[in-house]
């Protein structure tokens, strides 16, 4: 597509190289020039270079600035030289500024730093828990202190260098108690605004603590708004971007993006956790970030050059290639991150970046302007994560991820929806909307959901969904009681439970063996609790819906087999309490689960839980998904439309097992393990997949064709089957794109 004349450069297909110089002594940059960095980006196929204007020690990488000392080992004028060379090569340069870590400034103004309630300086770096007497290397400066004016000057200086964009990297101000700021500036401002002191201890029962928690987000968004305005006033066509790091920092920054999206041109989804997360993590984070940022904005996501945190040596070329492709298939722009030490010591895997960037350029036509195929959507509520999950966000997030991954494994088109987008115009795009323990739902969202289902939409809800309203305050009733045909009577709190079938012929139980379904999981910590908190709990409901399955009780608190005290107990008998219900509301259908179905699939991964999720989607959906892929679950599929085209990405994750070992926690009288419980490997080899079949509902198959752009646009074998076009992919090695379009 050609929107060259109207769109900002950052809304067009981009390939990004981030080159980080994070070295106390700077030995890795001796002799390194800005022009060399621009040429490196160009040679690898990138059209954007991201570099520091100022590092975490406070040193600047350009000459003549006033916001910090020049880096002592800088050759030439790195940022300006990169900009000049980039102009010649067609490489845009984005400057990283306003890093909240600044050691030089801290040494001059220690009282500008963030400090926690104990008076400890809040750190960006990782320090062993019991290390004493540590001097901060990357102290975090406070966004309420005079640092807020200092970073504005940083932005002004960077723009004067001629850069094409401003990137706020590691712009951190957390609400979490250990990392939340209690400096004099924060205390003073908060008291002026609210009339009382900051609560010193976390107490979610206290409205003052909840207000303080939410206030910290407003501080960050206020700074984003000020800096965005500054950038757009001085250089309207410059990019303004924020690093959200969506799977890190307890996921809190997703709320910053959701609530501050009006002040962001783009978001960088840093994915440094990718090597100890499942294959597909980067794809998941891109889709999550796109939901938070809103339609039509740009998400760039990173694949590190290195494995885990071993920054001085590269990962496997396969791992680098597949990680970059994970971004592409999710509709993001690929971003490769390399550190100066690994560039100095080992460049052997750089060609992996070049290969994927060349692929990306080859398929630009099919990426530009493509939009996701809307079918199923999983709602992500940042307010629920914060106010329900609190200091255990995984108790909510695992439920979300379980539904998402189950549908990904079944090749069902699935997106995320941000809480603020629970409005009619967004909901009606989808055949199915999933509320995975979405506890906190304000009235306007409830009204939109009711309207959506009444109009024929399909709704899946679990556990405590809609039991809290405005401000996430308990209502002791479902806000969606009428829609779900369920009344909330309480919570059954047991360490283990079961679900048994009441109507085995119901579509929600299709393909499910008529055996008890275990609810609950053991604790992998096992220091204070035997089981994962709340996992076996059920809402107690009075239901006018069809009761498809019921809650059953265990015979004891824990099991006596194998590992006595850790194993689950045997089944005792059914209670008659509903566990799964099905109903209609207006023209739509609903399925409700009194327990946390998604959390079970995320933690345990048994096929019964996945089949229950798939059945629910098929049951409540208005229509079948318009595309079906027959391939192993290790093949990641993503679907986009582009005018009359349907574009399908196939990414093969059929690797060696990445996570080799995991601990199961300690017990009384512990003994050493047999080997380390923390072994994480990169993918080394991909197993090709044969005979993948794709079915697309097109109406008249004779009018459509399928081609493979990465195979020189070769035509794929197709046949008609009623209204379905059936496409055969003989062999999937690492990555393929399939384009279905009208003939002629």
Where do the PLM segments sit?
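Short, acidic/polar
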Residues: 25-43, 145-157, 250-259, 316-324, ...
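Active-site-adjacent "subsite" loops/lids of carbohydrate-active enzymes
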Residues: 27, 95, 99-161, 186-217, ...
């Amino acid at each position: 597509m050609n929107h060259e004349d109207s769109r900002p450069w950052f809304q067009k297909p981009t390939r990004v190289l981030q080159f980080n110089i994070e070295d106390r002594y700077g030995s890795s940059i001796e002799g390194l020039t800005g022009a060399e960095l621009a040429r490196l980006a160009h040679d690898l196929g990138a059209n954007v270079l991201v570099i520091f204007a100022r590092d975490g020690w406070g040193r600047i990488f350009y000459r003549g600035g006033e916001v910090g000392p020049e880096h002592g080992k800088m050759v030439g004028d790195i940022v300006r030289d990169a900009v000049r060379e980039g102009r010649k090569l067609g490489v845009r340069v984005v400057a990283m500024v306003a890093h909240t870590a600044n050691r030089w400034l801290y040494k001059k103004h220690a009282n500008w730093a963030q400090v926690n309630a104990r008076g400890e300086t809040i750190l960006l770096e990782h320090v062993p828990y019991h290390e004493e007497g540590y001097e901060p290397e990357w102290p975090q400066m406070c966004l309420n202190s005079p640092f807020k004016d200092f970073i504005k000057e940083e932005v002004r200086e960077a723009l004067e260098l001629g850069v094409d964009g401003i990137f706020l990297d590691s712009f951190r101000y957390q609400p979490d108690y250990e990392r939340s700021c209690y400096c004099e500036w924060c205390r003073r401002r908060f008291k002026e605004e609210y009339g009382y002191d900051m609560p010193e201890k976390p107490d979610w029962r206290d409205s003052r603590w909840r207000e303080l928690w939410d206030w910290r987000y407003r501080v960050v968004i206020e700074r984003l708004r000020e800096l965005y305005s500054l950038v757009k006033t001085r250089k309207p066509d410059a990019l303004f971007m924020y690093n959200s790091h969506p799977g890190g920092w307890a996921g809190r920054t997703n709320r910053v993006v959701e609530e501050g999206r009006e002040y962001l041109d783009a978001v960088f989804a840093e994915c440094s956790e990718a090597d100890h997360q499942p294959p597909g993590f980067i794809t998941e984070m891109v889709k999550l970030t796109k939901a938070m940022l809103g339609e039509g904005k740009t998400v760039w996501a990173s694949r590190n050059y290195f494995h885990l945190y071993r920054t001085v040596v590269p990962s496997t070329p396969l791992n680098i290639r597949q990680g970059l492709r994970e971004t592409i298939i999710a509709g993001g722009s690929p971003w490769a991150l390399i550190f100066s030490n690994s560039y100095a010591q080992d460049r052997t895997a750089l060609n992996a970046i070049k290969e994927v960037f060349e692929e990306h350029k080859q398929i630009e036509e099919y990426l530009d302007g493509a939009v996701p195929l809307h079918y199923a959507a999983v709602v992500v509520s940042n307010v629920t994560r914060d106010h329900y999950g609190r200091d255990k966000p995984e108790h909510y997030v695992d439920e979300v991820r379980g539904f998402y991954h189950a549908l990904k494994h079944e090749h069902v088109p699935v997106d995320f929806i941000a809480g603020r987008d629970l409005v009619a115009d967004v909901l009606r795009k989808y055949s199915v909307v999933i509320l995975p323990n979405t506890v906190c739902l304000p009235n306007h969202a409830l009204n939109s959901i009711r309207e959506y289902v009444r109009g024929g939409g399909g709704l899946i809800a679990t556990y405590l969904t809609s039991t809290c309203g405005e401000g996430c305050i308990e209502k002791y009733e479902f806000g969606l009681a009428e829609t779900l045909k369920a009344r909330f009577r309480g919570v059954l709190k047991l360490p283990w439970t079961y679900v048994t079938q009441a109507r085995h012929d119901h579509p929600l139980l299709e393909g499910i063996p008529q055996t008890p379904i275990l609810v609950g999981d053991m604790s992998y910590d096992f220091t204070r609790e035997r089981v994962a908190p709340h996992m076996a709990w059920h809402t107690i409901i009075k239901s006018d819906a069809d009761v498809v399955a019921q809650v059953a009780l265990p015979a004891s608190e824990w099991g006596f087999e194998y590992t006595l005290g850790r194993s689950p107990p045997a089944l005792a008998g059914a209670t008659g309490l509903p566990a799964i219900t099905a109903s209609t509301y207006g023209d739509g259908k609903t399925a409700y689960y009194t327990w946390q179905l998604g959390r079970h699939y995320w933690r345990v991964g048994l096929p019964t839980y996945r089949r229950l999720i798939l059945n629910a989607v098929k049951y409540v959906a208005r229509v079948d998904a318009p595309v079906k892929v027959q391939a192993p679950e290790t093949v990641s599929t993503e679907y986009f439309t582009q005018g009359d085209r349907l574009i399908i990405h196939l990414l093969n994750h059929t690797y060696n097992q990445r996570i080799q070992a995991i601990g199961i926690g300690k017990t009384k009288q512990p003994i050493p393990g047999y080997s380390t419980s923390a072994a994480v490997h990169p993918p080394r080899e991909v197993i090709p997949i044969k005979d993948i079949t794709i079915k697309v509902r097109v109406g008249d198959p004779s009018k459509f064709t399928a081609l493979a752009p990465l195979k020189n646009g070769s035509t794929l074998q197709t046949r008609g089957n009623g209204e379905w076009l059936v496409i055969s992919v003989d062999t999937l090695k690492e990555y393929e794109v399939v384009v279905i379009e009208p003939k002629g």
